């Protein structure tokens, strides 16, 4: 398990660093960076399919699409939802929105807990229920003080919740399905990449090609590390360690000069408290499982 924790932390560190790394790719726009990230990351996704023995599952899904072409629409929809989130992740640090996106990632687990209860009738623990209430109070305070959440935070919460909910409802939660979602994004990614005027870009950033290849390497390595960790760790612990990435995103936001305005303090404090409660819940459940396993061995 210790190795799994280290691999998960590596994935979170790489994803968090990528948030900062996008600021080194100027003068490329968020759309340009997104296109090249998808192109350079896709080979790593294919490698992951081979490494984690998902080729049979991928072939089976392709055969299903061949027999029932309308199934391709589900992968296209999920691909678009996921792709927009990836674009926003790379766009935000260069456009003064990294804190808003970080707030969205802080709120996301709480929204997913609520969605799980409403749409999938999942049970909510006491800790998570309190976390949902506190996060809701934070959102209400932001609506009263600022008129609402930022559009970036709303897109993160609703977009990712819709993405994961659709995948769960259609039972398309494996790596093979993710590969097809990435494949659906290749045409638009290539189009975005071809629109880049590299002659102009290289005058400002002569090392841009090397930096883009490095972006793909960071993104691909992070993806593979996360998949490895997901196979080595319980889901509760994996989700708990995922908060490391969110914390790093907040640190990056402060590092590049963004500041929390006074009207956002109540929301920030409520989200941090909610995050801590979700983490406590994860630790508690994981500890209970370990104790139960020890009793079984006796």
Swiss-Prot record:
<protein>
    <recommendedName>
        <fullName>Uncharacterized transporter HI_0680</fullName>
    </recommendedName>
</protein>
<feature type="domain" description="EamA">
    <location>
        <begin position="13"/>
        <end position="144"/>
    </location>
</feature>
<keyword id="KW-0812">Transmembrane</keyword>
<feature type="transmembrane region" description="Helical">
    <location>
        <begin position="175"/>
        <end position="194"/>
    </location>
</feature>
<keyword id="KW-1133">Transmembrane helix</keyword>
<keyword id="KW-1003">Cell membrane</keyword>
<keyword id="KW-0813">Transport</keyword>
<feature type="transmembrane region" description="Helical">
    <location>
        <begin position="33"/>
        <end position="52"/>
    </location>
</feature>
<dbReference type="Pfam" id="PF00892">
    <property type="entry name" value="EamA"/>
</dbReference>
<feature type="transmembrane region" description="Helical">
    <location>
        <begin position="101"/>
        <end position="120"/>
    </location>
</feature>
<dbReference type="InterPro" id="IPR004626">
    <property type="entry name" value="RarD"/>
</dbReference>
<dbReference type="InterPro" id="IPR000620">
    <property type="entry name" value="EamA_dom"/>
</dbReference>
<keyword id="KW-0472">Membrane</keyword>
<dbReference type="GO" id="GO:0005886">
    <property type="term" value="C:plasma membrane"/>
</dbReference>
<feature type="transmembrane region" description="Helical">
    <location>
        <begin position="149"/>
        <end position="166"/>
    </location>
</feature>
<feature type="transmembrane region" description="Helical">
    <location>
        <begin position="72"/>
        <end position="91"/>
    </location>
</feature>
<feature type="transmembrane region" description="Helical">
    <location>
        <begin position="5"/>
        <end position="23"/>
    </location>
</feature>
<feature type="transmembrane region" description="Helical">
    <location>
        <begin position="238"/>
        <end position="260"/>
    </location>
</feature>
<feature type="transmembrane region" description="Helical">
    <location>
        <begin position="207"/>
        <end position="229"/>
    </location>
</feature>
<comment type="similarity">
    <text>Belongs to the EamA transporter family.</text>
</comment>
<feature type="transmembrane region" description="Helical">
    <location>
        <begin position="265"/>
        <end position="284"/>
    </location>
</feature>
<feature type="transmembrane region" description="Helical">
    <location>
        <begin position="127"/>
        <end position="145"/>
    </location>
</feature>
């Amino acid at each position: 398990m210790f190795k799994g924790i280290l691999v998960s932390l590596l994935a979170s560190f790489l994803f968090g660093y990528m948030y900062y790394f996008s600021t080194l790719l100027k003068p490329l726009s968020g759309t340009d960076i997104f296109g090249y990230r998808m192109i350079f990351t896709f080979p790593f996704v294919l490698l992951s399919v081979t490494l984690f023995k998902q080729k049979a599952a991928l072939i089976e899904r392709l055969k299903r699409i061949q027999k029932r072409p309308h199934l391709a629409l589900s992968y296209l929809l999920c691909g678009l939802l996921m792709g927009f989130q990836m674009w926003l992740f790379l766009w935000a640090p260069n456009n003064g929105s990294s804190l808003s996106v970080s707030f969205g990632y802080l709120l996301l687990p709480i929204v997913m807990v609520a969605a799980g209860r409403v749409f999938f009738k999942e049970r909510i623990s006491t800790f998570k229920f309190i976390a949902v209430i506190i996060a809701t109070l934070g959102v209400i305070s932001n609506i009263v003080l600022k008129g609402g959440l930022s559009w970036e935070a709303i897109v993160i919460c609703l977009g990712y919740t819709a993405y994961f909910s659709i995948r769960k409802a259609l039972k398309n939660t494996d790596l093979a399905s993710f590969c097809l979602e990435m494949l659906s994004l290749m045409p638009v990614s290539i189009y975005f990449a071809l629109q880049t005027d590299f002659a102009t870009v290289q005058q400002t950033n002569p090392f841009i090609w090397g930096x883009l290849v490095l972006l793909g390497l960071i993104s691909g390595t992070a993806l593979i590390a996360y998949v490895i960790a997901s196979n080595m760790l319980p889901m509760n612990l994996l989700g708990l360690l995922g908060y490391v990435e969110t914390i790093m995103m907040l640190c990056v936001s402060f590092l590049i000069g963004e500041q929390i305005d006074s009207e956002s303090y109540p929301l920030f404090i409520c989200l941090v408290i909610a995050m801590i409660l979700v983490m406590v819940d994860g630790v508690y459940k994981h500890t209970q499982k370990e104790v139960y396993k020890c009793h079984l061995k006796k």
